[in-house]
Amino acid sequence: MTRYIFITGGVVSSLGKGITSASLGAILEAQGLTVTLLKLDPYINVDPGTMSPFQHGEVFVTEDGAETDLDLGHYERFVNATMTRKNNFTTGRVYADVIRKERRGDYLGGTIQVIPHITDEIKAKIREGADGADVALVEVGGTVGDIESLPFLEAIRQMRIELGDQQTLFIHLTLVPYVAVAGEIKTKPTQHSVKELRSIGIQPDILVCRSEQPLPDAERAKIALFTNVPEPSVISLSDVKSIYEIPLILRDQGLGNRVCEKLNIKATAADLDDWKKVVQAQKNPRHTVTVAVVGKYVDLEDSYKSLSEALIHAGIHTQTRVVIEYIDSEAIELHGTELLKKVDAILVPGGFGSRGIEGKILAAQYARENGIPYLGICLGMQIAIIEFARHKAQMENANSTEFDPKTPFPVVALVSEWMAKEGIIEKRKWGDDLGGTMRLGGQPCRLKIDSLARRLYGEDRVIERHRHRYEVNNDLIGELEKKGLVISGRSIDDRLVEMIELADHPWFVGCQFHPEFTSTPRKGHPLFIGFIKAGLAAKEAKKAVLAAPSQEKTD
């Protein structure tokens, strides 16, 4: 029997419902329970796949090829369960499915309404996503009081009635602000947020109160009194330097035990030793390395959320504090590569569109010519191919057909056909819809013997997640290989280039897939760990060069 924990948010958005849900999931998993997490998004887009990163942040790709909310990335980084397309759905998807059923005649001519048809569909999707787990944590996007969230809140209210309080539990995440002018912590916003939630029929069982500092006992007692929540169930969650401390903080306040008690679950004590090691390693680095992330969405760091976390994970596993310098590729176009002079390694992430492309190409050229470790992900690999073709293979004006359809050397072109992981041939053509038509999800990759990629992974075949519409043009690969480009990874059917590297460079790697989606704080990822180690080596080599003249004078 699956138990359901519904997590809502109040007062303001961006309080950290996703991190809190994932942290509670980690605690319950450490107590011996099988856990899954769902995210219900109230926007009308079918999925975030075609949304601007500036509006939505990163699109997280699941193993089965769904384009989902970035919170699913948090879920996978905190728990061992793998998310699927069933773990995230939107208002748009719910309405699309209901309308499809109506057109098919499933409702036998009835009038389709929010209640019961939309709410029934929401409940069915929640049950489907939770199937097989001991506990399903269901995060409701948005803020209580938003009109968009009402169908989701109504659906979970109905689930409490249908399943009872031994199988459902409500957690409300709320803000308790500190007003500096008055010198006081204010509980009134939380009181009103709970009042709003109760007005639609939901009484929270547990409150998680976000604040700058830990809540004093007096304020916790006051919140408990005015919200009808027992004082032990008012949890204080103050700001922390690392999100990986949160499972420990919530465990120490007894949240996991409180949940198990309310849901009548017999569970063991939570063993969070792995999380203690992660936090200790992050707090006590022995080295520092500076990485330039050259992109065009750098004004919103959530656009590269999994990427920044993967670099942090690599730092944890190399005892290194990773300083990330986000550099706008258009700034490099304007001011040149001076912006890259002080970094130890360069990373060009994925992206779409022609804006800022030449700046990324300059960054790849700078890394190649100066022996600086380079990691190109998705578009970043394609950028490296374009740069190499132009400046090493004498292919003047080489480009991707995404940016220049009339380029004389289309070294990167539209992927028209590929073999999916299941052995099915997928096909795409110009003019297809943008949404859901890319090469998506986990795809197998075969690594070349004696390549850097093979050494980093320690195996000859890996599965990594993809999200792209363009690929390296096989017709021009031979010319590039003659000039020193190494194709170190290919798709299983040999049709697509998955990884490249340079034989005459200390560490220059490009991958068509997104390794950041499978990095976790407890395991890291071999590509990022190798990249950070290379950055440290480059930093030490630079120090040695700078020290050499003074050494000669001493001699």
Curated annotation (Swiss-Prot):
| Chain residues that bind UTP | 13, 186-191, 222
Q: Does the keyword Ligase apply?
A: yes
User: What pathway is this protein said to act in by its record?
Assistant: Pyrimidine metabolism; CTP biosynthesis via de novo pathway; CTP from UDP: step 2/2
| Domain Glutamine amidotransferase type-1 residue range list | 290-541
Among SUPFAM superfamilies, the record links this protein to: Class I glutamine amidotransferase-like, P-loop containing nucleoside triphosphate hydrolases
Q: Which GO terms describe its biological process?
A: 'de novo' CTP biosynthetic process; pyrimidine nucleobase biosynthetic process
Picking any one GO molecular function of the record gives: metal ion binding
**Does the entry feature the keyword Metal-binding, yes or no?**
yes
A Pfam family of this chain: CTP_synth_N
Return the similarity comment: Belongs to the CTP synthase family.
User: Mind telling me which NCBIfam families this protein's record contains?
Assistant: PRK05380.1 (NF003792), PyrG (TIGR00337)
- Give the protein's recorded name: CTP synthase
Q: Which organism is it from?
A: Coxiella burnetii (strain CbuK_Q154)
Q: Gene of origin? A: pyrG
